[in-house]
């Protein structure tokens, strides 16, 4: 009997030691109370290619995290929304439910969770990078972070996709009338759909992964995106005309599943947040530096570029004012005023 008891205790002790020795955790499993010695493997999803400033910044973030954690935390990037088969809203939902740990998504995509996320991207609400920085680093950014947090995602930092421009294969766009009847792809943001309807266009909601082929086949006539995305996605191969009008500012959320984040110890949380903020700052610098260079490259690729004057833009602003008025009621004047300051 004593031998049996002794044997049983030995088995239990061996099992306990084995359990203590196994500290590796996949972030998606959301183990609770992750300690400073626990290894983490985190999946990071981005909408665009690794060549875009998003991908370059995430690569820096991954390297910084691995180095500063002494190899304890490893991150793997999945570009082109590959984890959700190109479906951006589903990609965002995956971060909410924890099947994806981290993502970089535009607040335009967050709009599927709450129309208030349209706030920073209402037409010409934020007319300059100076105002964008003031808003995103101030009260407006804090309000936006609270909104993200309420959806089960912890916002670590804001990057930017930048100002969105419009391309098409039919004609130069200089006036609202030039948009009449054009089939323009938009993301699933109601305010953007309403904007193009006011301009007389035919907005078509579509995942970004489908855009190139749809333009190539003539399913749609045009699309709108920041300049680096237009270049890196080779949209110049299927689009002739580019109008630069800076009509929407487009922030990016560096977001992590909140349950996962809350399960981490304070030091790991701090490490992820600080390195994310460094990566976001780097991404913004890259994005703004690239804009002028990218415009020149798109011209070299054969695109006909029109840069609208303030007077030309005014005609579009007047046309879209009903959308601003409508969404002030939906979003709330206080939140919009925080972005206007």
Enumerate the language-model features and the residues they cover.
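Positively charged n-region of N-terminal signal peptides that target proteins for export
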Residues: 1-4, 8
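Enrichment for repetitive, rod-forming helical segments
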Residues: 9-10, 276
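C-terminal motif of bacterial Sec signal peptides marking the signal peptidase cleavage site
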Residues: 16-19
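N-terminal secretory/targeting leader peptides
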Residues: 21-129, 149-341
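A gly/proline- and charged-residue-enriched helix-loop-helix capping module
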Residues: 127, 131-145
């Amino acid at each position: 009997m004593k031998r049996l008891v002794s044997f049983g205790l030995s088995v239990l002790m061996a099992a306990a030691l084995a359990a203590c020795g196994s500290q590796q955790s996949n972030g998606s499993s959301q183990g609770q109370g992750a300690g400073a010695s626990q290894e983490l493997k985190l999946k990071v999803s981005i909408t665009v290619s690794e060549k875009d400033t998003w991908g370059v910044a995430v690569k820096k973030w991954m390297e910084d995290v691995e180095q500063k954690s002494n190899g304890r935390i490893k991150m793997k990037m999945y570009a082109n929304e590959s984890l959700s088969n190109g479906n951006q809203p589903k990609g965002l939902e995956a971060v909410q439910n924890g099947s994806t740990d981290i993502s970089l998504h535009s607040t335009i995509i967050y709009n599927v969770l709450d129309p208030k996320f349209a706030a920073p991207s209402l037409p010409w609400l934020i007319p300059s990078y100076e105002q964008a920085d003031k808003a995103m680093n101030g009260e407006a950014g804090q309000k936006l972070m609270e909104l993200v947090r309420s959806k089960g995602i912890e916002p670590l930092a804001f990057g930017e996709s930048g100002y969105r421009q419009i391309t098409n294969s039919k004609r130069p766009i200089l006036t609202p009338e030039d948009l009449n009847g054009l089939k323009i792809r938009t993301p699933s943001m109601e305010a953007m759909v309403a904007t193009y309807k006011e301009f007389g266009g035919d907005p078509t909601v579509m995942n970004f992964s489908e855009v190139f082929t749809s333009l190539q086949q003539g399913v749609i006539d045009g699309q709108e995106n920041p300049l680096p995305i237009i270049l890196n996605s080779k949209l110049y191969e299927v689009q002739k005309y580019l109008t630069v009008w800076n009509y929407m500012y487009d922030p990016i959320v560096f977001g992590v599943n909140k349950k996962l984040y809350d399960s981490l110890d304070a030091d790991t949380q701090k490490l992820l947040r600080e390195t994310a903020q460094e990566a976001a700052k780097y991404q913004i610098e890259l994005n703004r530096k690239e804009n002028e260079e990218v415009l020149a490259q798109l011209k070299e690729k054969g695109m006909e570029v029109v840069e609208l004057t303030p007077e030309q833009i005014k005609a579009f602003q007047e046309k879209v004012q009903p959308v601003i008025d409508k969404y002030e009621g939906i979003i709330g004047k206080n939140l919009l005023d925080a972005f206007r300051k």
